[in-house]
Amino acid sequence: MRDLQAPALPPDQGERLTRDAYKRDFRECEATIRDAASWKLERRQHFEEQGSPSRDALRRGQWEEALRLLEDRRDALRAAEEEDTQRGHTFHRVRVVETPLTPYMQWELHSHRQRAEYGERIRVTDAVQTASAETAGPLPEIVVLGGSVLFQVLYDDAGCCIGASRHTDHGTVSNWASYLEKLFTAGEDIASYFTREVAPLPPPRLRRD
């Protein structure tokens, strides 16, 4: 993928949203999608997610509890997939991975593998493959919903979400949707990647608070 350069993302075209406004707008936009695809690019190797009991357990250094709590959401994942199927909505996720895996990434790949069991399309690409597109800095965190709106999700240095930049310019949204589709096609399915690279790993060494 050396010749796969990322499209432009003009900052002056985006509308800056607070975290709460982004979450609200995301939910409203997603609910209207019919017979369309969405795309997400994840590049950072560490996030401080909120509202996830499993993530909280990881933060406390409780690895087995973190994995157990992932099991508790299977009914919710199944229901979400059934709703997406009824609406004709397919969600694709591209996960850029650096090695060795951070403790967060090891946990997230367990989470993603489970999501894939319920229909989410997830593929992994090594950071080496995207290096040529990152000469000016890491790729942004991007979500394209239904081909109509793009969110560049913004984070602070600790990995906490602080909001997003909302883009609706047709050319910008279309170019990024096409780019993420190419990254997705070039990546490896989460199932085979997980079996080879993640399943054999011992629990990550975590600091207990």
Task: Label the predicted regions.
Residues 1-209:
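PLD/PLD-like phosphodiesterase catalytic module centered on the HKD motif
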